[in-house]
A protein has these predicted regions:
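Carboxylate/His-rich catalytic cores and anion/metal-binding grooves
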Residues: 176-181, 217-233
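Short, surface-exposed helix-loop/turn micro-motifs enriched in polar/charged residues
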Residues: 196, 212, 232-233
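Segments forming glycine/polar-rich beta-alpha architectures that bind adenosine-containing cofactors
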Residues: 206-212, 217, 223
């Protein structure tokens, strides 16, 4: 079993996850997308909708909740992208486990030696970013479903190719080159053109900084971005 995550560069607030399973013997797998709200959040609401059209069926798993202070409304939505043709996809079932937890799942038989891949697309947004975060999260997820996996990854890759046109190249020191590219990748991962948000000091590694911005950003991060990608700066 392998997983690949794509934080889609061309679609803010949207992520794509590939799950690939290779069977060593005949098996039946059950794949599930579980959405659980942390206990600290308030007024959790869970939604499940199926959009059935002649060309597509979309299973939409959505949750919303208020921040601990009640100031912000936070919303998330996701859907499956199957590799089968329309009309041949596995049946999706919705289950409600608790007030703050629900899931959608499917089952599929896989023969020995067969490799099966399915994908989950999801979006998360708050009222700090949009006046109607619930509909915006669902809209972004529906758009990702309609685009399809291949187009999403293609446009994601093209967006990163544009960023890498501005580069730092080091001759004769492969390790330093790799280190610099790693730093650039992580810096770009937490910044975006068209937003006033500052890069997080700890990225996605934890909640300890709670959104605070420190001198690290101005002293170390901003100058490099200003030189490499002024539009982002």
């Amino acid at each position: 079993v392998s997983y690949t995550y794509y934080s889609l560069r061309h679609l803010p607030y949207t992520v794509l996850m590939d799950i690939t399973v290779t069977a060593k013997k005949d098996i039946t797998i059950t794949g599930a997308s579980v959405m659980e709200a942390p206990d600290a959040l308030r007024d959790v609401q869970n939604y499940y909708n199926e959009i059935d059209r002649p060309h597509v069926v979309i299973s939409l798993l959505t949750s919303s909740a208020k921040s601990p202070t009640g100031k912000l409304l936070m919303c998330a939505s996701n859907t499956f992208l199957f590799s089968e043709h329309h009309g041949q996809e596995p049946r999706v079932i919705h289950e409600m486990w608790d007030n703050n937890m629900h899931l959608m799942k499917f089952s599929r038989k896989i023969r020995a030696g067969e490799t099966y891949r399915y994908t989950i697309a999801g979006s998360s947004i708050t009222s700090a970013h949009h006046d109607d975060p619930l509909n915006e999260a669902e809209r972004a997820t529906i758009f990702a479903k309609l685009e399809g996996r291949e187009r999403l990854i293609n446009f994601h890759t093209k967006a990163w190719d544009e960023l890498w046109k501005s580069d730092i190249q080091i001759d004769g020191d492969a390790q330093s080159q790799q280190d610099i590219h790693s730093m650039m990748y992580h810096l770009y991962s937490f910044t975006r053109e068209g937003t006033a948000l500052s890069p997080s000091p700890m990225g996605l590694s934890g909640l300890g900084y709670n959104g605070h911005v420190f001198w690290d950003t101005d002293l170390w991060m901003f100058p490099a971005v200003l030189v490499l990608n002024p539009a982002i700066a």
